[in-house]
């Protein structure tokens, strides 16, 4: 079975109970199944809270955080430091051999500046699978932050969805976007099992897919196009469904390019 990349929504970092349910499910799953799993995370909520405390402006353009040179150290510390180690600590507390990484470790993802007007924001491309394959073969659980380093040593903040997509391409892995929603819902509140770009556009125009879900759907569609395979959107609230998700069952909404 191909490896699985689990991209965690940042809101999970604000929910200790959700983190516990996730890692309890992962531990139980690893007792019976050996599918290699890598966790990728951002942490936008955590960064926003930090910026407010430091009285620094939060500026976003098309969903990307503008990251000036005087803020990249703070943001890197929040994502590759606090967010990454919080997840790693919870995983270790549940008996998992977790190892905290960034996109730069082992050259797993190649990162370069996206746009000078955005500052230290990076675009991600697949890199070398060697380190991750060695860690997975040794039964480690890599937990990867969305901070990367360019070839000339520049720290870069990468959109977590794009980071997860690049890592999935690096490993030839499936991608699961795990968030606080169980999937995409129709106008009657029922879960939509399968979604295409055409169907998504229609539901957006009808006002059924709105706000933050539009961002999630577009990110999943872009990932599916890039990877050439379906991408799943599902929720972490129902722990009993997580093992099925880890085994590739479409418990949430399966996105087809």
Swiss-Prot record:
Gene3D superfamilies: Acetylglutamate kinase-like (3.40.1160.10)
Residues with site note (Transition state stabilizer): 7, 216
Keywords, comma-separated and alphabetical: Amino-acid biosynthesis, Arginine biosynthesis, ATP-binding, Cytoplasm, Kinase, Nucleotide-binding, Transferase
Binding site for ATP: 180-185, 208-210
InterPro entries: AceGlu_kinase-like_sf (IPR036393), AcgluKinase_fam (IPR004662), ArgB (IPR037528), Asp/Glu/Uridylate_kinase (IPR001048)
Keyword Oxidoreductase tagged: no
GO biological process, one term: arginine biosynthetic process via ornithine
The enzyme's E.C. designation: 2.7.2.8
Chain's role: Catalyzes the ATP-dependent phosphorylation of N-acetyl-L-glutamate.
Name of the protein described by the UniProt record: Acetylglutamate kinase
Name of the gene: argB
């Amino acid at each position: 079975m191909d490896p699985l990349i689990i991209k965690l929504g940042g809101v999970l970092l604000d929910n200790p109970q959700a983190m516990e349910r996730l890692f309890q499910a992962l531990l139980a799953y690893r007792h019976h199944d050996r599918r290699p799993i890598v966790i990728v995370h951002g942490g936008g909520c955590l960064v926003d809270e930090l910026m407010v405390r430091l009285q620094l402006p939060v500026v976003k353009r098309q969903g990307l955080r503008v990251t000036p040179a005087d803020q990249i150290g703070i943001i890197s510390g929040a994502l590759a430091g606090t967010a990454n180690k919080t997840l790693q600590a919870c995983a270790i507390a549940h008996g998992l051999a977790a190892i905290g990484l960034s996109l730069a470790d082992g050259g797993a993802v190649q990162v370069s500046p996206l746009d000078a007007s955005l500052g230290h924001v990076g675009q991600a491309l697949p890199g070398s699978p060697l380190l991750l394959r060695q860690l997975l073969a040794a039964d480690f659980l890599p937990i990867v932050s969305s901070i990367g380093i360019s070839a000339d040593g520049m720290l870069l903040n990468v959109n977590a969805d794009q980071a997860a997509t690049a890592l999935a391409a690096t490993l030839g892995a499936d991608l699961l976007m795990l968030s606080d929603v169980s999937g995409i819902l129709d106008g009657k509140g029922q879960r939509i099992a399968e979604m295409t770009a055409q169907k998504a556009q229609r539901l957006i125009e009808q006002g059924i897919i709105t706000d933050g879900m539009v961002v999630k759907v577009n990110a999943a569609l872009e990932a599916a196009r890039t990877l050439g395979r379906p991408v799943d959107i599902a929720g972490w609230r129902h722990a009993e469904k997580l093992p099925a998700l880890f085994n590739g069952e479409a418990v949430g909404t399966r996105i087809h390019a």
